[in-house]
């Protein structure tokens, strides 16, 4: 599977001068209804309404509703309909912003009232009325900023966007951007009178009837422009699709995603928690979660050792000047925790005898790794030098964006920094990408595409020439992999471009996993050198790489990917013996002892629960192997297997049972064992 293609799947057509794009679409015989209806056109990379009229003959790409771009436009238009419904039912509400987002949309409102589920039901009803009316989306351009300000005098949040054009470069601000200030009127299809309007740069679908299926999903509190220092707002989320069938499939996916939510499973399976006493975004792993985490780390550690990485360890805090040298304090200070001022010495009268220093919790490991590299002279014979650490870092995330294990404030990165020569650079990047993809596949994630994040023109260090060389090198390595490469303009860190490995989970959702960043700037800032073969001193090229992203995030993704039913080799408890009666417990204890002797995490349930209750309990805990024993099993020297899918195999000789479990775990299979897969009683 590849990344979603946002572009049109329809062949280009020509729009004659003075003719609307919609007319050209109809004359070309392209559909105007259904899930493949043309909703907008693309002109030189920009999306335009079907009412757009070119001044000269122009070739355009028709964009269908069932493409990513088509859905995005439908969702943006649905956000407008939502805002119209809110202002009809809650006239006091002031408009914020309402962008399309992945699989949906939202709109922020300045209102003291917190929307209830009953409110969402009423809003959906009102939206359906507006959609049924078929109101036309009509674009008009303001002749001046003053004209826009006059019309929006009662909309303070819109006025802010108009007055300073803030958000012109923000993809979530659809109100302003480009060379014009424009608004969209919702027009009554019979009278042509305006029913409602909103500041917006567009584009939009032709009429509200082009929103075939939608649902409001939830509401929450928010801050204007996501800044806690700004006004508090109420946000309503929704989703919209090109057909009822597509919406139904998405809602089913949402229900399954809720069942797989790692925050919910973390509690049910006793894996981790977020105690209030510790703080937001700071998880603690319980014994069972600790086992899963250790298995993740141990396997990764072994693979890194085999690949020639050298393990290092660095402290959690450092002096301020280290991050001044690296540039983090200039470019990343918003993501860092406040400094700790320590080591000051005072005289008895309170005057300073020795000034203190600022220390920071480290947000990244790389500066400390550079100091390890620089601790002694380096030769070209040592390169590539691959330094690796499971390093704890701390990043200040706003409380509103902290989310379970996937967005935390304290995390452990499987962080590597590779120092190589320019001549080795391409080969090292190629082998590194292969290593990353292979290791992720070993954990059961094997559906990938790549993103190439390039320079943010407002936030970078180094010369344009260096950035261009680094970007071209990464692009070539990515293309050589054969995976789809999706551009991410302006998405790079301040010190270099990066490749991001995007992995799809069992529900088809994309997660950013590994990042590979090429950096020519940091070696210069830290004066990193090596002695070349000709005796001259040269600077190495630096490759930053985090394979999991963070252990916490990877743990959360795998929990949802497997719905808590981890592969047997990762499962906290791999086998549980369930005696039919108390008298059978000693027999199962012997079998469990055999399993433990071969490294299997096994136990016997000797609780007072009835056998059926024990089976239900351990099935709900996603234990991959349940071993049942009664009188016949004891007499025959056998056990009965019970699997996660509730199938059962009876009368398996105990030695064969032990061997089958040990073999399955050691083979690191990433699917749940079943009677069919285990092939009990069958020879190889």
Curated annotation (Swiss-Prot):
Organism the protein comes from: Mycobacteroides abscessus (strain ATCC 19977 / DSM 44196 / CCUG 20993 / CIP 104536 / JCM 13569 / NCTC 13031 / TMC 1543 / L948) (Mycobacterium abscessus)
Binding site for Zn(2+): 366, 417, 544
Gene behind this protein: thrS
GO molecular-function term, one example from the UniProt record: threonine-tRNA ligase activity
Subunit-level organization: Homodimer.
Stored InterPro entries: aa-tRNA-synt_IIb, aa-tRNA-synth_II, aa-tRNA-synth_II/BPL/LPL, Anticodon-bd, Anticodon-bd_dom_sf, TGS, Thr-tRNA-ligase_IIa, Thr/Ala-tRNA-synth_IIc_edit
Domain TGS: 1-64
Role noted for this protein: Catalyzes the attachment of threonine to tRNA(Thr) in a two-step reaction: L-threonine is first activated by ATP to form Thr-AMP and then transferred to the acceptor end of tRNA(Thr). Also edits incorrectly charged L-seryl-tRNA(Thr).
E.C. no: 6.1.1.3
Classification via HAMAP family: Thr_tRNA_synth
Cellular localisation: Cytoplasm
Keyword Electron transport: no
Protein name: Threonine--tRNA ligase
Pfam families attached to this UniProt entry: HGTP_anticodon, tRNA-synt_2b, tRNA_SAD
Lineage: Bacteria, Bacillati, Actinomycetota, Actinomycetes, Mycobacteriales
Cofactor note: Binds 1 zinc ion per subunit.
Family: Belongs to the class-II aminoacyl-tRNA synthetase family.
Gene Ontology biological-process annotations: threonyl-tRNA aminoacylation
SUPFAM superfamilies for this protein: Class II aaRS ABD-related, Class II aaRS and biotin synthetases, ThrRS/AlaRS common domain
């Amino acid at each position: 599977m590849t990344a979603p293609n946002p572009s049109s799947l329809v062949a280009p057509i020509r729009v004659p001068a003075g003719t609307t794009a919609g007319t050209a679409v109809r004359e070309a015989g392209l559909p105007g209804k259904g899930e493949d209806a043309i909703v907008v056109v693309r002109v030189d990379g920009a999306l335009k309404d079907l009412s757009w009229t070119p001044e000269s003959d122009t070739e355009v790409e028709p964009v269908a509703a069932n493409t990513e771009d088509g859905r995005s436009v439908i969702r943006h238009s649905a956000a407008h309909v939502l805002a119209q419904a809110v202002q009809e039912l809650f006239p006091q509400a002031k408009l914020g912003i309402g962008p399309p987002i992945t699989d949906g949309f939202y709109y922020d409102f300045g209102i003291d009232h917190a929307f209830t589920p009953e409110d969402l039901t009423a809003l959906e009803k009102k939206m359906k009325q507006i959609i049924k009316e078929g109101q036309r989306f009509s674009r008009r351009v303001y002749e001046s900023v003053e004209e826009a300000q006059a019309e929006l005098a009662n909309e303070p949040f819109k006025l802010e966007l108009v007055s300073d054009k803030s958000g012109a470069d923000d993809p979530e601000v659809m109100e302003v951007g480009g060379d014009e200030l424009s608004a969209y009127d919702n027009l009554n299809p019979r009278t042509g009178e305006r029913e409602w309007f909103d500041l917006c740069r567009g584009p939009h679908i032709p009429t509200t009837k082009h929103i075939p299926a939608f649902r409001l999903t939830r509401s929450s509190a928010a801050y204007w422009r996501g800044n806690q220092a700004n006004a508090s707002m109420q946000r309503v989320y929704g989703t919209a699709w090109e057909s009822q069938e597509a919406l139904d499939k998405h809602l089913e996916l949402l229900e399954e995603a809720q069942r797989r939510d790692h925050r919910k499973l973390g509690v049910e399976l006793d894996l981790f928690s977020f105690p209030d006493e510790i703080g937001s975004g700071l998880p603690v792993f319980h014994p069972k979660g600790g086992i899963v985490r250790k298995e993740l780390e141990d396997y990764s550690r072994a693979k890194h050792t085999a690949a020639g990485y050298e393990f290092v360890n660095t402290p959690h805090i450092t002096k301020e000047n280290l991050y001044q040298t690296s540039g983090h304090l200039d470019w990343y200070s918003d993501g860092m925790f406040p400094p700790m001022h320590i080591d000051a010495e005072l005289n008895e009268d309170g005057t300073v005898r020795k000034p203190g220093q600022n220390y920071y919790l480290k947000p990244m490991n790389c500066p400390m790794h550079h100091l390890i590299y620089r601790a002694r002279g380096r030769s070209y014979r040592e390169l590539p030098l691959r330094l690796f650490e499971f390093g704890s870092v701390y990043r200040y995330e706003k409380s509103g964006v902290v989310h379970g294990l996937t967005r935390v404030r304290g995390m452990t990165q499987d962080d590597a920094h590779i120092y190589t020569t320019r001549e080795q650079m391409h080969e090292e990047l190629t082998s590194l990408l292969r290593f990353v993809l292979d290791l992720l596949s070993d954990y059961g994630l094997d559906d990938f595409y790549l993103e190439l994040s390039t320079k943010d023109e407002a936030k970078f260090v180094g010369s344009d020439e260096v950035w261009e060389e680094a970007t071209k090198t990464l692009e070539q390595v990515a293309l050589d992999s054969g995976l789809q490469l999706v551009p991410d303009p302006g998405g790079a860190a301040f010190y270099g471009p990066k490749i991001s490995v995007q992995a799809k989970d069992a529900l088809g959702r994309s997660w950013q996993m590994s990042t590979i960043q090429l950096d020519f700037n940091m070696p210069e800032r830290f004066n990193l050198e090596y002695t070349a073969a000709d005796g001259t001193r040269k600077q190495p090229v630096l490759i930053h790489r985090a394979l999991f992203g963070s252990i916490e995030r990877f743990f959360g993704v795998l929990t949802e990917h497997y719905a808590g039913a981890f592969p047997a080799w990762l499962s906290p408890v791999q086998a549980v013996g369930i005696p039919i009666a108390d008298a059978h417990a000693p027999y199962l204890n012997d079998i469990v002892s055999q399993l433990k002797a071969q490294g299997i995490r096994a136990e016997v349930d000797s609780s007072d629960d009835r056998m059926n209750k024990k089976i239900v309990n351990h099935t709900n805990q996603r234990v991959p192997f349940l071993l049942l024993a009664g009188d016949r099993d004891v007499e025959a020297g056998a056990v009965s297997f019970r699997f996660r899918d509730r199938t059962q195999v009876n009368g398996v000789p105990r030695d064969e049972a032990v061997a089958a479990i040990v073999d399955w775990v050691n083979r690191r299979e990433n699917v749940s064992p079943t009677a069919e897969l285990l092939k009990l009683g069958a020879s190889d």
